């Protein structure tokens, strides 16, 4: 079933008036007709099961059949700090990170980043990445659209991460899977977690030292060297599994 996002202001009791590019997609691409069903999320934790009533000028008019609290968001905020990769890899990373439950994605320029973006190019890239995030959120039935932040320097990204409960830095020279397991096992639902991923070539040693000084925890993801587009998604997958298992266990204990 199709899934779209609407601003809460579009919701008026038992009716939603959807505007913007999604209307053209519904009407002319999907050719949705009156009576067809669709899910609408307001981005603030409420999902609406609706039926299409019709189209008026630049709006799609939907009738709310039922509403419910979104069940697809993690209890924790997982923030992916991604060192700028080459080519179009960032688009793929954004898409998959959203599917895996990332709350926010922060691109940053590391010492070994090959890609250099001026302010104008960075702005255009961010618009593109945000559009991809929205599409991925709709496809994966997310209750909200994760934000892609402006490109930061490594220092700016570290300062941004200071307010988080836990900050993890997968690092190829770090050893000890037991230590990684111990760190992740202590993460509780509701905590905010930052994940720092280096670009191609990894982190410079001085960046790891700086990360440690701010309280970040270097971890290993195993014996193999992962690509920049794989490392973050691997970490998100591990955290998603851990947190959802903890949530289910807590729900079971409450019942």
Cite the ranges covered by each PLM segment.
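N-terminal positively charged helical leader segments and presequences
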Residues: 1-69
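Structured adenosyl-cofactor binding patch, chiefly the S-adenosyl-L-methionine
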Residues: 204-255
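Short, hinge-like loop/turn segments at secondary-structure boundaries
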Residues: 122-126, 186, 237-238
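Generic structural signal for residues in well-ordered beta-strands
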Residues: 62, 145-149, 218
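Residue-level signal for inorganic ion chemistry
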Residues: 35, 97, 133, 211, ...
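Short, ordered loop/turn segments at secondary-structure junctions
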Residues: 9, 67, 109-112, 223-224
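Active-site/ligand-binding-proximal alpha/beta "capping" segment
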Residues: 165-202, 206-208, 216-219
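RNA substrate-binding interface of SAM-dependent RNA methyltransferases
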Residues: 71-168
